[in-house]
Amino acid sequence: MTVRMIALCGAAALAFSANPAWAGESTDDAASAAAAEADTGAGEETIVVTGYTGTKTDTALMELPQPVKVITADQYQAQGAISISDTVKYAAGVLANPYGRDTRVDGFNVRGLDALQFRDGMRDIFSYYASITSDPYNFSRVEIVRGPASVLFGQGSIGGLVNLVSKTPDFTTRGEINLVYGSDDRKEVLGDVNLALAGNLAVRFVGRARDADTYVDHVPDDRVMFAPSIRWQATPDTDIVLTGLYQEDDTGSTSQFLPIIGTFRPNTVAGEQLDRYTFVGKAGWDRYAGRSLQGGGAITHRFSDAVKLSLKARYIDSDLEYNTHYADSYTNPQDPFSVYGTDGRTIALTADASDARMNVFSTDNNLQFNFATGAGIEHKLLVGIDYSWNKVAKRYAGGDEIVDLYDIDYDALATYDPTGPFIKESQKQLGIYVQDQIRFRDRVSVVLGARRDRVTGSSGQKDNATTFRAGIIGEIGAGFSPFFSYTESFLPVAGRIDNGDGSFGDPYRPQTGTQYEAGVKWQPTPNTLVTATAFKIKERNRVLYLAAGGTTQSGELNTKGFEIEASHTLPGHFELLANYGYSKLRSETNTSLDYMPRHIASLWSTRTFGLVDEAQLRLGAGVVYSGKSVSTSDIWSIVTPSRTTVDALAEISWNNWRLAINATNLLNNKYFASCLARGDCFVGAPRNVMGTLGYRF
């Protein structure tokens, strides 16, 4: 990236351009909150956490009949997160990086199902390999809604969604600068400056510049990110926030799609194994490089204590160049090298080149009414309308050649340049929703909601759906609050059935799902919360990719599971998070779909100690466990073993300075994240160590 060193210097200059005093953690607009508010009590601090994403209203988590997880930036940075996928690995029922670290996309499964990613309550990814990944430093927190959420968010995934909440200005002047050096020659400068220009006007600048390699040769991980925002409180009742983002990535693919034979299983003919981090492409040509430009705004106006208007909109313009190679381990997964020779080394290598452009416009607008209908009966009535339009255009080129995968002549590999017309697909979605949160005598909460969606695709395909949600939670004493909920989901699928012979059939049917869930939340003290829940999900019309080529759609799939999540926090002193999740998918006709680990567990804890001269030492450690996974096809089954990784943190802070050492996969466990019966394997990321020198002002 030609601008990398200029950007490093520029980010440093930006961060040092302000000179006020540091005022602690970032505090974003309470109107978009799911934040922790600390009030000093009798001898300890009390944490009241509200969840916005679960209901689009500020509601205490103990009043939500659905599990919602809020992960603050301080938490996931302490855990050593370097991607959005990493931020969610200590959440119950969430599998982060199911195919290992992937520099191209963020991957996470919620309740065994792929989860959609939202930004500030609006979906921001509509196609694989058409945009670059989001930067975790640009967000104040990550929210996870487990279970369907279509009533509020429209087209959504069945298992749940991950919502990223952007950093926005407040009216306290402060800032920070961080210098990072780490594994794979990672060099970074990060800056976050918040300036209060007046009592009702503030700006914020968040930036990152990174020059880094990865554990795979010839795959860089370079980034420039700059996110300005401005907040104007026009009146005491009117709040306006404008946000922007420019991000440029120059990376490749850490997922090399290596054959099972020669990695996970022995290659008895060749008599040797491939290195687990083998690069199979052409240096300088294989790349995943793109740019994302975003602009958005939010207006909140309170007409009175009883009526509030919220308006949001965002536009995304992104482009991407994606060139890659991968071996043909799919024609004969059990012996891929025998297809092209007898030496156990020769295989076909496919080169794919693509250019992609993506444009997205989203808006979400609602009115909230607070009123009472009797003694001790309070309502939060939400009525809203949202609209989104997205267009994705791609063009392709590529070819195949025969290579010795153990000794590739990289210079001889052919390259391709997409020059043909772009293949375009677009989609429009309009939704109307209504939700009523009813609170009875400050002990029982009922949530009722309904939504109507209309989706139109560029092929003329039209889908309509009505989805519902209902839930109840009530406090029965001793901090126990049992809950029950029913939710539905609706996800239109663009395109048509691929017949596998170059022709296409009927349009895809929308994916739909329903979920029943029952559980209990226990809050014995204000700083402790335990949630246990059991669920059953029924899913229809998942798109399936056939081994012989082409696609089809599933019939009915059923997923059952159980989760338990516990947290105990004393701000500034101690933190403990413990999670366990179990899920199992059943299909009457296709056993190959149950390939995700059934068991996921994690434990994370930090403790802060006082040192001399007001210095503090914070130590942290965590363990993440993923159970074995089984991938099945008509010819064989592949069992990927369970794995356990350890993370650690050591941090010293003194006055405005901070020195931190983060390590993920501390013991350097060399594991496979997933091996698929179709023929390829994905390795887990090795140990990553980062040192951070930070200054807050």
Regions found by a protein language model. Give the residues of each.
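Acidic/polar loop-and-plug regions of large Gram-negative outer-membrane beta-barrel proteins
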Residues: 210-214, 227-233, 237-300, 320-358, ...
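Structural signature of Gram-negative outer-membrane beta-barrels, strongest in the C-terminal barrel
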Residues: 231-235, 358, 377-382, 386-388, ...
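Face-selective signature of the C-terminal outer-membrane beta-barrel domain
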Residues: 295-317, 347-460
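Outer-membrane beta-barrel translocator/receptor signature
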Residues: 137-140, 151-228, 234-238, 293
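Acidic, small-polar-rich N-terminal luminal/periplasmic segments of exported/outer-membrane proteins
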Residues: 37-172, 518
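Gram-negative outer-membrane beta-barrel transporters
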Residues: 26-27, 442-443, 536, 553-633, ...
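Surface-exposed extracellular loop regions of Gram-negative outer-membrane beta-barrel proteins
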Residues: 250-263, 391, 473-517, 529-552, ...
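Membrane-embedded beta-barrel scaffold of Gram-negative outer-membrane proteins
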Residues: 299-302, 306-314, 318-324, 475, ...
